[in-house]
A protein has these predicted regions:
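Membrane-water interface of transmembrane alpha-helices in multipass transporters/channels
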Residues: 369, 458-467, 508-513
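Transmembrane alpha-helices
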Residues: 433-448
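Conserved catalytic motifs of ABC-family nucleotide-binding domains
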Residues: 449-494
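Active-site lining segments that contact anionic ligands and/or coordinate catalytic metals
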Residues: 6, 264, 298, 315, ...
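Membrane-protein biogenesis/insertion across secretory and organellar systems
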Residues: 1-380, 557-581
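Transmembrane alpha-helical segments that form the functional core of multipass membrane systems
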Residues: 339-408, 415-416, 422, 426, ...
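Terminal, Lys/Arg-rich, intrinsically disordered segments and adjacent short helical elements
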Residues: 1-62, 383, 387-434, 476, ...
Length: 581
């Protein structure tokens, strides 16, 4: 490697350390203090505060609309997969406890347990939650009913129906919201919002970029993450050109669903009758994980305005999914809810890899083994391409002496040098870029794995050797606060090993690209799910074995295509002249 290459590698490593420092500093910082919110003193009713979607105002928690004083109480309903804790404070699911999924300290995963508003709570303005409900539990089907009558005579009845043990989707809760006009006058509302509850990292190492608010309108899914609320600028350079934002608010027709997601879990509210017309979302300061501040996201799905004549009643129905980001379960909910997986542009590759990994797991019963076997299958399928690329690179290596002579001859004429090089490649039938082909093919596969392994619930708490959780970085210890993750380091080492034994093409630009690849992949994988580093390390080792099988072969003796063509033509003529027996 030349001097410039070493300088670039050192700068990349320094960038990795700087990014790790900034990552911890930025995402451990709590959001700006909230502005004035509704407060209540004993014996008084809280005052409703109506937020407006302006960047200047901060909003950390939804306000409570004015409501009569009612004693707070909770009611739990359980199934074999989840326990739902209902609260009459805002008439919704205070938290959903997923009994089959473990979080820190081997405790069950709790959704919506981080100081956020209840799932299924309603409000009549963006950022507002209506409280003061009476709560009843009725029937054998575990239904929980909330009732409230507002001062103008609008009666609100909310009925939650948790899933049965044998339900096809064990995390889908039904919700009916009914409005009845008990007054003698016409009542009008400018629509209402149904809360998605909140989402926040479950594990201290979960990536904040997966804490998102997603919504689908007209079949198109849009989303923001917690960084959307940050001031515009470059924080570590002290540059800022726009202020922090506190409320995300959008008005769109034909909204099918809205939801909040963390890295491996999500809560989605889907309208089943009337299409939604608006959404809102805010960021909030969630409960600390391992003494680290984490940020959460909460939001709501809004329905259009309605009017009720005296005695008239209307109702809307919703489905609420509060559970793991399971592709099949989300796809079964319809309406493109599987977009909550956030697979991105290589989603079709991610879906295939997830299906293949789960299929192999059905035979092996181990996800680390499934990833290794899947990697070997992929490498075997790409063997013809890899073998052809290796042969082409060996041809390039055979031309290396000629290229050295040519560089010396035309060292002061770069354009002439390039022209002569390309002429030589054509004469000898060599493709100088063929060595990059296997890497170009594997890049989409890598990003498919990257997206899949970053969201696939299957990998949570799956172990491999020293790795306790394949969905998290494999940090063994820290040095001055910097995590030492072994698998990405082994992965980078295997890439360097592969680079050393790969036939040199003689092309300086191609060699420089190869030098950078270990550092680039190290940055990509260092703080990511260790399963990704396991995949790339496995494929590197398999490539090294392939290279060792071919490296001891002598370099090919190259001839110009014109010479080969003449010899073949002469052989053809000789064959035609041969007398028939």
């Amino acid at each position: 490697m030349d001097r410039q290459g070493w300088i670039a590698v050192i700068l990349c490593i320094a960038g990795l350390v700087l990014w790790q420092w900034f990552y911890v500093k930025e995402y451990s910082r709590p959001p700006e203090p909230a502005g004035a919110t509704a407060t209540a003193t004993p014996g008084t009713e809280p005052t409703a505060v109506t937020p407006t979607p302006t960047p200047e105002r901060t909003l950390e928690s939804p306000t409570r609309a004015a409501a009569p004083s009612i004693s707070a109480r909770s009611q739990s309903v359980s199934s074999k997969n989840a326990e739902y804790v209902f609260s009459n404070d805002a008439g919704g699911i205070e938290k959903a406890i997923l009994l089959l999924h473990l979080a820190e300290q081997k405790q069950a995963v709790v959704l919506n347990g981080s100081r956020s508003m209840p799932i299924g709570a309603i409000g009549f303005q963006a950022g507002e939650v209506s409280g003061g409900f009476e709560m009843d539990r009725i029937g054998r089907n575990k239904q929980v009913v909330f009732r409230k009558t507002e001062e103008d005579g609008l009666e609100i009845i909310k009925t939650f129906t948790p899933p049965e043990d044998d339900a096809s989707n064990p995390y889908a809760v039904g919700l009916e919201v009914a409005f009845r006009n008990t007054s003698s006058s016409k009542l009008t509302r400018d629509g209402f919002y149904v809360s998605t509850g909140g989402a926040a990292p479950i594990h201290a190492k979960d990536l904040p970029m997966y804490t998102k608010f997603d919504w689908n309108h007209g079949g198109k899914t849009t989303g923001i993450d917690v960084n959307w609320f940050n001031p515009g600028g470059i924080p570590f350079l002290g540059m800022q050109w726009s202020g922090a934002k506190s409320l995300y608010n959008e008005l769109k027709p034909d909204i099918l669903w809205a939801g909040v997601t963390s890295q491996y879990f999500c809560t989605i509210v889907t309208t089943e009758k009337t299409k939604g017309s608006s959404v809102w979302a805010t960021r909030f300061n969630a409960q600390k994980l391992n003494e680290t501040n984490v940020l959460g996201m909460q939001g709501a799905l809004g329905l259009p305005p309605f009017s009720l004549a005296p005695g008239e009643k209307i109702s809307e129905t919703f489905s609420i999914y509060a559970g793991p980001k399971d592709l099949m379960l989300l796809r079964g909910m319809g309406g493109g809810q599987d977009d909550a997986m956030n697979f991105g542009m290589f989603g079709f590759i991610s879906e295939f890899l997830l299906w293949a990994m789960n299929t192999i797991h059905g035979y092996l019963g181990n996800y680390a083994g499934s990833i290794i076997v899947l990697t070997l299958l992929i490498k075997s399928a790409l063997w013809p391409v890899q073998n052809k690329a290796t042969n082409e690179m060996r041809k390039m290596a055979a031309l290396s002496p000629k290229m050295t002579e040519m560089r010396e001859k035309f060292k002061d004429e770069p354009q002439k040098l390039n022209a002569e090089m390309m002429k030589m490649y054509r004469e000898y039938g060599v493709n100088p870029f063929s060595g990059c082909l296997p890497m170009l093919i594997q890049i989409p596969i890598f990003f498919g794995f990257y997206a899949m392994l970053g969201s696939a619930i299957e990998l949570r708490n799956s172990s491999f050797l020293w790795v306790t959780d394949l969905s998290q970085p494999d940090t063994l210890f820290r040095i001055v606060g910097f995590p030492v993750n072994i698998l990405p380091i082994v992965m980078a080492g295997s890439m360097i090993w592969q680079m050393i034994i790969t036939p040199k093409s003689g092309d300086a630009m191609q060699q420089r690209i190869f030098y950078f690849m270990p550092v680039i992949f190290l940055v990509f994988c260092y703080n990511y799910a260790s399963a990704l580093a396991l995949y790339w390390t496995t494929q590197n080792i398999f490539s090294i074995v392939q290279l060792y099988l071919t490296r001891n072969k002598p370099l090919p003796e190259l001839e110009k295509k014109s010479v080969v063509a003449k010899r073949e033509a002469a052989a053809t003529v000789k064959k035609k002249k041969r007398p028939k027996t």
